[in-house]
UniProtKB/Swiss-Prot annotation:
Listed name of the protein: Cytidine deaminase
Single annotated GO MF: identical protein binding
EC class name: hydrolase
Species of provenance: Escherichia coli (strain K12)
Record Pfam families: dCMP_cyt_deam_1, dCMP_cyt_deam_2
SUPFAM superfamilies (UniProt xref): Cytidine deaminase-like (SSF53927)
Cellular component GO terms, alphabetical: cytosol
Length: 294
């Protein structure tokens, strides 16, 4: 079991501990539960889906990286496939506050970058901030997304974001988590190709500036993140954050990164290079390359 889970695990009910123990035994537990695993946990504990998601939130929050606030938020995104994806907030010392990742963004990106097609619900241990409510409004599940909070009745996103402004107001038809492929040729080594593939999946209907980041760890594992724009612009999630979300949730740490590649267009209206390289250097990675999409 990864050490970060030990404290939260010890506080779970005995029957949930017993059912989870073989799942969490792997140090690199992927911070997700398949539909089959969810069903097994429900049977072992007698909990329904909502109660089980609430019970698992401490494990999701244990994935938080909060050296600035020490305020850990956990989220679980429930995919229409039946898979549940953990998420947690992340802060980066030495970077800017704008690079911060919120727990809801983490769980949603985890699902999206894992190939999930849409979300049915998201469970969070604290009320989503306005930033996250706007981020969620970019999803193809839209205002129908169900939000579950401890001690409250579940409500749709529309109840948390009345009179919402979103992609439909800008006549955007392709939404976040819809399948997208921008068709750039995969060239270069494996890490470069992973970055280009991530750029091909970008959701960037507002700037037309595709980008992707791939991080290579010392053991050869590669984590890729795609750019995810938002109709309100500021809640946009950069591609580096997508890759860092996966790296963190899969049990790796920043010192494990040995090389990074950013893929983007040289003449794009928005450029990720400066922010990406600055944040990576703050995390201790200095081997950073850029490949140009063509």
């Amino acid at each position: 079991m990864h050490p970060r889970f030990q404290t939260a695990f010890a506080q779970l009910a005995d029957n949930l501990q017993s059912a989870l123990e073989p799942i969490l035994a792997d140090k690199y537990f992927p911070a997700l539960l398949t539909g089959e695993q969810v069903s097994s946990l429900k049977s072992a504990t007698g909990l329904d889906e909502d109660a089980l998601a609430f019970a698992l939130l401490p494990l999701a929050a244990a994935c938080a990286r909060t050296p600035l606030s020490n305020f850990n938020v956990g989220a679980i995104a429930r995919g229409v496939s039946g898979t549940w994806y953990f998420g947690a907030n992340m802060e980066f010392i030495g970077a800017t506050m704008q690079q911060t990742v919120h727990a809801e963004q983490s769980a949603i990106s985890h699902a999206w970058l894992s190939g999930e097609k849409a979300l049915a619900a998201i469970t969070v241990n604290y009320t989503p901030c306005g930033h996250c409510r706007q981020f969620m409004n970019e999803l193809n599940s839209g205002l129908d997304l169900r939000i579950h909070l401890p001690g409250r009745e579940a409500h749709a996103l529309r109840d948390y974001l009345p009179d919402a402004f979103g992609p439909k107001d800008l006549e955007i038809k392709t939404l976040l988590m819809d399948e997208q492929d921008h068709g750039y040729a995969l060239t270069g080594d494996a890490l470069s190709q992973a970055a280009i593939a991530a750029a091909n999946r970008s959701h960037m209907p507002y700037s037309k500036s595709p980008s992707g980041v791939a991080l290579e760890c010392k053991d050869g594992r590669i984590f890729s993140g795609s750019y995810a724009e938002n109709a309100a612009f500021n809640p946009t999630l950069p591609p580096l954050q997508g890759a860092l979300i996966l790296l963190n949730l899969k049990g790796y740490d920043y010192p494990d990164i040995q090389r990074a590649v950013l893929a983007e267009k040289a003449d794009a209206p928005l450029i990720q290079w400066d922010a990406t390289s600055a944040t990576l250097k703050a995390l201790g990675c200095h081997s950073i390359d850029r490949v140009l999409l063509a």
